[in-house]
Structure formats: structure tokens, C-alpha cells
């Protein structure tokens, strides 16, 4: 078998992204009746690309407003595209959230609303609840991002501090008919978790949000605590009649990207093991992947080389150092430290939105010589991991993957390629 391992890994990553791109997946899910007036709103890293599809396919009058991350915009003719900050919200996100809410207020039962939702929407559609400031939300968001909290935990807190999340946007649209089309970036593809579920009923409680804040030792102002202890902080609950005409449709999820990559692997002659959506600390998840790789190499279990291990989901990083890098660089650095130059093992870890954390790269690639090459440059994988400096480590090896914004987001993508004769 003749294959360029790094090229194959890059092709797998591209295949995973393409399988979840709005241009490929949205049109088939739009309403059969595409005539008449429709109001389009949206939030997330894929919002602009999704809006382009609606403009292309809709036969009637189209107008609306979507918000996406800075640099993730795309030109639309009828739908306004605004950019704002992610992962920590800014004034632009606050302003557009107010405009979105105004746009859907006072609608009639004859109106139709299309809501285009994707990962990043929680930060991009930032409208603090009464008595809570944007600065409060920014501070709490930053603390959550560094705490190691899961995306579900973070979004539980976010929706209970919001005037637009947790079903509140859907309630504001009543009595119009609402069609939400979502691209999932969360493990389990829960509608209540994707961008904090602005148009779906939410079973979580303010008490749970307070428990999460306590669990991770996050300091909050007295005004925020008072709000979370009030009845008004509760989100829109299942059975609320204001959501009776709100419909939710998942159009892309991480599993279909993993499945598409697996097909590509088999076409190249590699068997695959799909581990699915994973959560946990990036460095610990990497150690599990390393253990599976060693089991394959040493014992041919659970499958024999040549093969590829695929996984997705959203890991977390508890920041202890002052280095640079997102969760995928952290994963790959921990994998490098665990395998220590294991022959015949190559790996890629990247974020399908094209941005790993807050850096300019999507991810990075590890090769069998990464560990030794870095050591020759005076870089210790273990020390750099302690400093959360995955970006700096792989930048020194010229091994960063830079894709620019992809305008979709089905979260992390990881592929470990194991060649035959990989034993030391």
C-alpha cells in the first residue's frame, strides 16, 4: 500500500468538513413550500453560509439578519450579515441580539421564521437578562472557558443568564411558525445544548446553573446570584404553548462527518474504528487514544493495522499555564508525549470550524518524528503540555493546519493513522 500519511489525514479532515457544510446539507431540509414571505434570523459560525443557501433556494420574499463570528461572514443580497466576537461576547453581539429580538416581535400566525443555528451562537447572540450586564456575562464566560466545564455545563449557565436563549427567542416569535435548522457541534446533538437552544424548551433549572458555578469555583456578582435565585431566571419549559409552532430540524452532526471520513479511509485501503463523540480533558482523552493505538500495534486489537482511529466531540482544557493553543493542539501534544515517536503512527486533530480555540489554526499534525524533532529544538512535550502550549510546539515543527474559517462547525475531528509494521 502506497500512501502519503499526512496527505491522507488532510483529505480526511476536508471530507469531514465538507460533509457538514451548509451548501451540502441545508437545501433538502427547507420547507417544501418556498413561496411567500419569510423572515430569516440566525446565529453561529455557519450562519452566513446557511443564509446564502436560503437566499438561493427561496422563491418568495426574503429578509432578515444573521450574526456570525468575525471572519466567518459571507456575502448575502437580502439577508444582513453581522459579525461579532466568539467565544467571549462583545457589544456587537449584544446589539445584534436586540435587533433579532425586535425583528421577530409582534409577528402574526401567518408569518414564517427560519432560524439558522450553529455552534458559536451562544456567544454571538448575547442578550443578558434584566439586571445583568454584558461585563458580567463576559467575566463569567471567560471563567467557564478556563474551568474545564463541559459545553453542556457552560450552556446551562449561559441560558439562565440570557434574555434570548433557553427557548426565549422561540417564545418571542409566537404565534408565527418557526423552523429552526441546526448544525450540531455538541456531544449527543441535544437541541437544548446547541447554542443554548434559543427556540426549544429547556428542562434545566437555575439551581443547576448555580451548582455548576459553585462546582468550578466561579465568582459571580451579587446581582447575578440574586437573578439566578429568582423565578424569572427559569427558561421556557417543555409543554409551554408559546413553542407549539416551533419546529427543530438537525441538518448536520459530528457523526455524519466521521462516517464520511470512514468511507474515505476504506477507499484508501484502511479499516476504521470510530470512537464517536468524546468529552473530557483533552490531555486525558489523548492518553486513551494512545492506549488504543498501542493495543492495535502490539496485539492487533480491536482491529489490525493498517487502520485509522476516528473520533469527534468536544474536549475541554483546564488552563494552568500561559502558552497558546486550543483543545486540539492540546490533544495532539498529549498524544505526542504519550507515544514518544512510535514508528508508523500519524495523527491529525482539528476543529471543523477552522479555528482551534482563539488561534489562527484549525489544528495540527503529528508524525512519528515530531517528538524527536521537537526535542532537537529544545522543546519538551511534557513541559509544553504543562504550559498549555500546543500551538507553540507544533508551530516550531511547521505542523499547524491553517484552513481559514470553514463556515460550518461540527466540533473536533481527530484521526490517528497506523501503518503496518508500526512496532518499535
Q: What annotation goes with each model-predicted range?
A:
Residues 68-109, 152, 157-158:
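Glycine-rich oxoanion-binding loops at beta->alpha junctions
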Residues 1-41, 49-50:
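An N-terminal, well-structured beta->alpha segment
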Residues 132-149, 202-217, 321-347:
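Gly/Ser/Thr-rich active-site loops/lids in small-molecule metabolic enzymes
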Residues 269-349, 358:
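Active-site segments that bind and position negatively charged phosphate/pyrophosphate groups
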Residues 176-179, 201-290:
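Accessory alpha-helical/coil subdomains and C-terminal extensions
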Residues 53-62, 78-80, 101, 105, ...:
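A glycine- and small-aliphatic-rich helix-loop capping segment at beta-alpha/alpha-beta transitions
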Residues 105-193, 198-201, 378, 386-389, ...:
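Glycine-rich, mobile lid/loop segments that gate access to catalytic sites or pores
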Residues 332-423:
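Internal helix-turn-beta structural module
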Amino acid at each position: 500500500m502506497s500512501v502519503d500519511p499526512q496527505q491522507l489525514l488532510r483529505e480526511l479532515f476536508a471530507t469531514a468538513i465538507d460533509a457538514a457544510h451548509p451548501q451540502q446539507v441545508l437545501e433538502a431540509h427547507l420547507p417544501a413550500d418556498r413561496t411567500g414571505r419569510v423572515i430569516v434570523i440566525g446565529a453561529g459560525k455557519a450562519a452566513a453560509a446557511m443564509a446564502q443557501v436560503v437566499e438561493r433556494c427561496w422563491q418568495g420574499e426574503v429578509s432578515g439578519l444573521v450574526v456570525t463570528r468575525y471572519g466567518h461572514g459571507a456575502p448575502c443580497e437580502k439577508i444582513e450579515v453581522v459579525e461579532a466576537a466568539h467565544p467571549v461576547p462583545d457589544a456587537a453581539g449584544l446589539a445584534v441580539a436586540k435587533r433579532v429580538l425586535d425583528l421577530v416581535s409582534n409577528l402574526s400566525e401567518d408569518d414564517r421564521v427560519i432560524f439558522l443555528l450553529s455552534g458559536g451562537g451562544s456567544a454571538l447572540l448575547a442578550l443578558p437578562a434584566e439586571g445583568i450586564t454584558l461585563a458580567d456575562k463576559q467575566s463569567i464566560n471567560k471563567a467557564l472557558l478556563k474551568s474545564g466545564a463541559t459545553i453542556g455545563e457552560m450552556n446551562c449557565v449561559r441560558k439562565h443568564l440570557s434574555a434570548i436563549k433557553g427557548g426565549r427567542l422561540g417564545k418571542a416569535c409566537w404565534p408565527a411558525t418557526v423552523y429552526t435548522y441546526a448544525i450540531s457541534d455538541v456531544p449527543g446533538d441535544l437541541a437544548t445544548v446547541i447554542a443554548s437552544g434559543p427556540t426549544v424548551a429547556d428542562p434545566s433549572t437555575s439551581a443547576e446553573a448555580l451548582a455548576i458555578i459553585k462546582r468550578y469555583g466561579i465568582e459571580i456578582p451579587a446581582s447575578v446570584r440574586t437573578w439566578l435565585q429568582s423565578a424569572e431566571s427559569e427558561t421556557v419549559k417543555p409543554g409551554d404553548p408559546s413553542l407549539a409552532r416551533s419546529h427543530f430540524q438537525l441538518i448536520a452532526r459530528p457523526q455524519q462527518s466521521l462516517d464520511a471520513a470512514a468511507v474515505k479511509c476504506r477507499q484508501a485501503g484502511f479499516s476504521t474504528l470510530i470512537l464517536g463523540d468524546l468529552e473530557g480533558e483533552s490531555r486525558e482523552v489523548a492518553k486513551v487514544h494512545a492506549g488504543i493505538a498501542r493495543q492495535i500495534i502490539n496485539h492487533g486489537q480491536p482491529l489490525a493495522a493498517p487502520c485509522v482511529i476516528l473520533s469527534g466531540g468536544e474536549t475541554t482544557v483546564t488552563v494552568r499555564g500561559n502558552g497558546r493553543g486550543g483543545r486540539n493542539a492540546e490533544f495532539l501534544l498529549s498524544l505526542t508525549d504519550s507515544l514518544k515517536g512510535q514508528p508508523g503512527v500519524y495523527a491529525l486533530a482539528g476543529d471543523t470550524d477552522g479555528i482551534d480555540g482563539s488561534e489562527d489554526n484549525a489544528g495540527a499534525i503529528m508524525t512519528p518524528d515530531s517528538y524527536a524533532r521537537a526535542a532537537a529544538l529544545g522543546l519538551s512535550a511534557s513541559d509544553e503540555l504543562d504550559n498549555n502550549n500546543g500551538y507553540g510546539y507544533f508551530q516550531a515543527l511547521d505542523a499547524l493546519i491553517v484552513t481559514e474559517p470553514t463556515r460550518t462547525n461540527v466540533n473536533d475531528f481527530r484521526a490517528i493513522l497506523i501503518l503496518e509494521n508500526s512496532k518499535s
